[in-house]
Amino acid sequence: MRVGVYTLQKVLYQGEAEAVNCQTATGEITILNHHRPLISILKKGVMKITDREKKEHYIPVSAGFLEVRSGDEAKFLVEEEAS
């Protein structure tokens, strides 16, 4: 699926992925190809993106929103965890 993770200032990840794990307002979810359409609030946690080469990318998130669209596309607007 196509995945984009954005802040208001920059692109944190953009590319193909096999899975995305994240914390939502209702608990932890894993988004895979052919996931049903969904809009949700993201809670504080670490987002894990597994790309097509099985490499894992970790993005600390303090808050945000996600949208999963039909057609295998997931977009995330996030606020990065302060370091």
Predicted region positions:
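Compact, glycine-rich, soluble single-domain proteins
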Residues: 2-83
